[in-house]
């Protein structure tokens, strides 16, 4: 069963600063779903969240972020994933809320045979703006990463994407991809 975590903005002009530290030890398997929501669909607020995901040797980590802030929230989210040898990490980020949402994702593959999958879906309407920045950092040889972001825009909504794949000189046989689709 997945572990579910809920963060709420309950009042006008409220701020939240959630931090998730997830350490999956050797050969562990875990799924975490983190929800970000507002009690009122018009309440202004500010959210700045951080999560640190660590997949130990042979571990399997699945992380889902469901961001559904109200239409007047400014949201910042920083995600860091470290993948050790023969481990895998999959993160899925769903963005439908907030007036402005900035999402930064760093995935570091530090062990041979590590794999990281970075997936995101953003559905933007009215004048929403979703800004995504990513770095897939291949430090060890024989690692793999795959990024797939899909965006749906309506009205005057905007999405921004900046992604980088870095391969260290000794990280031979790296397999890395990025694809962003907009509709």
Label each region the model flagged.
Residues 1-183:
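Conserved beta-strand/loop scaffold segments within soluble protein domains that form the structured core
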């Amino acid at each position: 069963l997945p572990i579910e975590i809920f963060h709420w903005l309950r009042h006008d002009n409220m701020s939240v600063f959630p931090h998730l530290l997830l350490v999956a030890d050797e050969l562990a398997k875990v799924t975490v779903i983190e929800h970000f929501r507002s009690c009122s669909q018009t309440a202004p607020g500010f959210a700045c969240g951080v999560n640190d995901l660590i997949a130990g040797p042979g571990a399997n980590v699945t992380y889902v972020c469901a961001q559904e802030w109200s239409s007047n929230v400014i949201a910042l989210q920083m995600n860091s994933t470290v993948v050790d040898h023969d481990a895998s990490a999959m993160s899925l980020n769903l963005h439908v809320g907030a007036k402005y949402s900035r999402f930064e994702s760093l995935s570091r593959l530090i062990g041979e045979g590590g794999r990281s999958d970075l997936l995101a879906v953003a559905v933007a309407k009215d004048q929403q703006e979703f800004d995504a920045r990513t770095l897939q950092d291949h430090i060890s040889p024989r690692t793999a990463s795959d990024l797939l972001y899909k965006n749906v825009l309506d009205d005057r909504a905007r999405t921004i994407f900046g992604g980088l794949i870095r391969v260290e000189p000794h990280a031979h046989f790296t397999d890395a991809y990025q694809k962003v689709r907009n509709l």
